[in-house]
Amino acid sequence: MLTPRTRVLTALNHQEPDRVPLALWGSWYGVTDRLYFAALAELGWEPVPPFRPELLHSVNYYDDRLLAHLGVDVRHVDPGSIGVTSRVGPDGADGYGLRYSTSGLYRSASYHPLAEAGVDEIMAFPLPRAEEVIAAEPILARIAQIRALGDEYAIVGRAVASYGLFEMAQSLRRHDQLLMDLALEPEIVHALVGRLAECYGALLDRFLDIAGDALDLIELPGDDFAGNNGPIISPKMYDTYFKAPYTALIRRIKARAPHVKVIYHSDGAIAPFLSRFIDIGADVVHPLEPLPATDMAALKAEFGGRISFMGGIDIRKTMQGSEAGIVAEVKERIGQLAAGGGYILAPANHLQADVPPRNLFRLYTAARELGTYPLATGT
């Protein structure tokens, strides 16, 4: 039997390991706090301290015990930058100048500091400084903790920011304004995206300088360029504004840590963008959501030799449904995506509070049972 790390790396090299590797609890495929507590109640365990003590997100805990119980092959290292920049200052703003409103379990930006800014204001706007938001000591302590767990896991660096270039630009500028800017004010978009790319590049540099030798994968701050039925912006606009900055960020990662695989997150019906994600240098794309507009088997056939897929498990209906439905989805997804390697099974997004703990457990037992190579005929 392969070690978890070898299992993951074999799959990402487009070869078949002993079974399909499994992931959970990354930046976009985590266990929300309420589900975490419910799962612990089922197991009779006490919670661990939160890795985000500010408790400002829906996912604030990370429990290696639960990952071991589920048979997950990856472990994550948090750069700390999201937690630090989420802290609210005396003016009510976070590290990016955003202010938030809370609705139910979630919060969203309600004050957008650059909504009316011109290019000069954008260029002068203060953004987080890497040395102030990423500290070496907790990162190195976490790496040592993972190495002491007893199994050799694939180590994933979590994203250095909650939002990618597109989504953070929307938050700072305001969603509707940024979308209009894409069509009418190209110099504003180029200035803002350029500033963010330089900020993120500095964050990635510092994280990799501390942890790069230990990491096997790293999550790039993700962007949703598509909705459930198709693109939010045109592929041409992606090429105009985002392709070059993301290419530069990935080259920056590879220059510091050539061995590290880059995970790129983009929700929705992303088929029109997949070739572009390959062009920018992404090694893995998450989440490949199961949507009517997404033909999983066709995407595997067309792109599976050039990029790996992570995710694929529906979190909107399947995970709230029957255990039989979960088993059926796992079987279908493995059949569509796992042949020849290049697939890591994971939720398509964070598992929410309405997921019964038994369904979380069943997802991963089914994946271990059905994901053994060589794949069964008809899987």
Which residues does each predicted region cover?
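Active-site loop segments of alpha/beta catalytic cores
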Residues: 1-39, 45-49, 93, 99-108, ...
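Segments that shape or occlude catalytic/ligand-binding pockets
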Residues: 33-80
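A composition/biophysics-driven feature that prefers long, compositionally simple stretches
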Residues: 73, 80-81, 89-92, 101-116
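Short, glycine/charge-rich beta-strand/loop segments that flank catalytic centers
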Residues: 77-89, 159-162
